[in-house]
Amino acid sequence: MLGTLLASCSSLQTISFDQLQAADVSFPDAVRKVAVINNMPVLKTKDNHEILSSELEGDGKVASEALAENIANVNYFDQVIICDSVFRAQDKVPRVNVILTNEEVRKLSEDLGVDMILSFDRIHIQTKPGVLFYPDFPMPIDAVDGIISPIVRVYIPNRDKPLFVVAKQDTISWEIEPALSDRKIVKEASEYAASIPVEHLLPHWDEVARFYYDGGNIEMRDAGVYLRENNWDEAYSQWKIAYEKRKGQQKMKAAFNIALYYEIKDNVEQAKEWLGKAKKLVKSGSRDEQLIAFYSLE
């Protein structure tokens, strides 16, 4: 589970690791087969390389296929079906209301043999001038920023309204170069837009960064050695000894590290309890107090 990256900063060290994040929605246990449908109209996109449009609509076929692939890769459902044929084939412009009716949801579910429908309803792309910065290049690069706003609705048969709606924004950038066109922006933005709903719909892993205290006494130094060997249980044992033996700020730092240990072990209640112990020991107005306050908000 842990991929660690350690960097020194006085007695503070940083560590990064993968942490499982919960989804924003819970599905009924009976939902094992799902379908992703393309609920967007087909709009022609210019391949003009000289003038870029400020407002664009995404490619439903590209987006729905990418969303189905992204969901299938998580291995959360037994089966993911893609229905990328155009559901709104006759639409010439995006509809204001694209919510599926109960009858449409029922028929789609029966025809496709699924328990749930994920309807990719729209991708709005707003472009504006931007800049890119590269570490080894001294000057900013002219770019186009694309503000991407996908909308995905989740349906279960026999419900009066969607179970869940994902309507989030994100931004990606393209370096301005001769091959850049509306068509390229729409294709790549549509592929990227399909990644946005997944973290809201399904449990996923995110890399998170945390601080811990290293050194200052023999127990904390030994714990740091164990931690760099990825031996969290032995590190915890040394922190616990330090907490019981030491006083003042050394005791506070041991409590803070024990809170991290319990977070790693997915024991949220114990992590909060030990963070609270550290908070009671910290000096008012110190950097340590700011650090604990930051974690208390998370």
Walk through the language-model features, giving the residues of each:
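N-terminal segment of the mature soluble domain
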Residues: A30, V36-S119, R159-F164, S286-R287, ...
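Short, hydrophobic/amphipathic alpha-helical packing segments
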Residues: S64, N102, I148, S190-V198
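Sec-dependent signal peptide recognition
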Residues: M1-L2
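Amphipathic beta-strand/beta-sheet edge segments enriched in Tyr/Trp
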Residues: S119-I176
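Flexible, glycine- and charge-enriched loops at secondary-structure boundaries
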Residues: S53, E57, I141, R183
